Amino acid sequence: MIYYVIALFVIAIDQISKWLIVKNMELGTSIPIIDNVLYITSHRNRGAAWGILENKMWFFYIITVVFVVFIVFYMKKYAKTDKLLGISLGLILGGAIGNFIDRVFRQEVVDFIHVYIFSYNYPVFNIADSALCIGVVLIIIQTLLEGKKAKE
């Protein structure tokens, strides 16, 4: 299925980008891309977003495995008839596995995309995080559109 190819693409880009950061940047260093907006910053995270649940790797292992099984089941059941859902789940699956690989092999997640939004220093993130968020946003949009159609 094409949706698994999307997941594999996300995993590949995520892992290659993280490898490049680890091999070429010292931890904590930053390269400005757009001053005061976008930086490439070598950062490590031993928790989830904003560092919550730091050093709780077993929790993340269990949750991720359960989550991945659920996503694969859901993809097999519903993605055949719903392309947007399939794309969304492919992005989510790739993102979940990308960060899982880091947790298993590094005991931390490599983050490097550093954004300032209206002077707010947003937590550093990575390609897997982006894919997860985009997938979730697409599902929310689809749900809202379906709700609107049902009302008509």
From Swiss-Prot:
The species this protein was found in: Bacillus cereus (strain G9842)
Active site: 111, 129
Gene it is expressed from: lspA
CC terms in the record's Gene Ontology section: plasma membrane
HAMAP family in the cross-refs: LspA
E.C. number: 3.4.23.36
Membrane-traversing stretches: 55-75, 85-105, 124-144
Signal peptide: none
Family: Belongs to the peptidase A8 family.
Major subcellular site: membrane
PROSITE patterns xref list: SPASE_II
Pathway(s) it belongs to: Protein modification; lipoprotein biosynthesis (signal peptide cleavage)
Protein name in the entry: Lipoprotein signal peptidase
Localization terms from the record: Cell membrane
Pfam families: Peptidase_A8 (PF01252)
Classification lineage: Bacteria, Bacillati, Bacillota, Bacilli, Bacillales
Source superkingdom: Bacteria
Catalytic activity: Release of signal peptides from bacterial membrane prolipoproteins. Hydrolyzes -Xaa-Yaa-Zaa-|-(S,diacylglyceryl)Cys-, in which Xaa is hydrophobic (preferably Leu), and Yaa (Ala or Ser) and Zaa (Gly or Ala) have small, neutral side chains
